[in-house]
């Protein structure tokens, strides 16, 4: 089974929280100037310098100064300088259809990189000299040069494939010649020593490049970048994750996933599945769906002592990408559930809703605060995955599943898929903001009319305990095929209508199966939600709360013990501030029956407040 997603050009977000966050990210991307993005590459190529009063670019002189430069990890003195440009290009490749400005800037950046490569001799393209890799090969220290190079090469690859920029592929192919020549004389042991220093997703780049070119030199790079010391022990069942750098390993496994897709060799897939078992099913995740604390994997089944600095944003984003690989291979609902949880309680929770900035970590302990990055003074690795994370979800709702369609996410959006029988199938997912709750705030004509016009149907008296979505499926040619709708694990009940008529719900492997003729049909699905307590695996007396897929944060800066039965979470938390103007507020609650009250809001809405996610709960009566 191989699921096929809509291309970025055939996916458009509808109004709502995700579109708001998408546009916030787009605004941040456009604020980063080409001059700053290119500076480390032009400097290395001898095409830029600064003497204290002005910048000098060969062929032109421009006013410049440190006050306008990028700093933090992008500082001219940082060995990780230049990483953000690669992330930017990867994001831009998926956004050029949504923003002509982004597309034009991306093409300009690629052209300038080609100029830098030519100035470097025709192959080397990097924001630092070749000796950084020579130091790694000699067993000396340099701060992850291949990590940075991966970001650039992946950005060029994405520009070639999704951005349709042929010059990007030319730059990448010439760069591959340098790596082929550099690694050719090395023994397997020497290669393994180099791969022990963070390489990012270089394996994924080489696999994708081999697919594009069919060049055996690129196939050889795939084999050279196979990190046997890690992969073979994974296959043997050894725990090679606990207390290891999580994002290093995830990026390498993404390379295995791509190598499997390109070569068809099942041994690559075996590595991916062994990793998923160790990282997720056999280890457990936090209530958010995320993993890692302080950038390293927490021990299997142990979380209570590691509620600080949880789920590095890079790990969230890259694990979502890995879940997407596995979902496309298998169609299994569990991978879609993982993806959904990490989107809502990771990607959204770690992006400031007003500034668009990223939080490196998402602490879950008592009295936590989110630490937000600065637009130009930090440039953590997570600034880069921030740019890319918000390009993942526009096309997430539906996939082509052979001769069927599989709807795995209820992302407000319009998608177009090329169906073998029905031609172009347009799928529109729209939340019902009057009779259901959806994450975020939703201004809509329907919501406005429901409070303004007395002759239109009213809204429920109280906040509904459900999410409702209307899915319009419109086929160019009427055809008989199967549509599958995922039933989330958090849904306590599900009802479905087709063209207004109720149907018997049959759930098979986590999906409702609708096998019928399709032309222009309306499917309404209602997913019942409830407040649920989730205990820590190693301290079951501490629980976190969710409302459907939404993790709740209690706005309190100290540890407070809640009195009551966690099995009856609805008795502990009561609806609060449930309605605002023309929409229902999702995930807003207050405690009930406690000496001192606590207000709860969605974790993704927390900005500067102190908050707590995991609370001790005692059945002892309130004193």
Outline where the language-model segments fall.
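Well-ordered alpha-helical segments within folded domains of soluble proteins
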Residues: 78-97, 106, 144-160, 195-211, ...
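Carbohydrate-binding/catalytic loop surfaces
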Residues: 37-77, 125-144, 193-209, 236-255, ...
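C-terminal beta-rich recognition modules with glycine/proline-rich loops and embedded aromatic residues
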Residues: 272, 337-345, 350-443, 449-467, ...
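Low-complexity, Ser/Thr/Pro/Gly-enriched N-terminal "stalk/linker" regions
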Residues: 1-84, 103, 107-130, 166
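Structural helix-adjacent loops and short alpha-helical linkers that scaffold large soluble proteins
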Residues: 5-8, 12-15, 95-107, 156-173, ...
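Active-site neighborhood of glycoside hydrolase catalytic domains
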Residues: 178, 195-234, 240-302, 306-333
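Solvent-exposed beta-strand/loop surfaces of large extracellular or lumenal domains
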Residues: 491-516, 531-538
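A conserved hydrophobic secondary-structure block that centers on an alpha-helix together
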Residues: 132-212
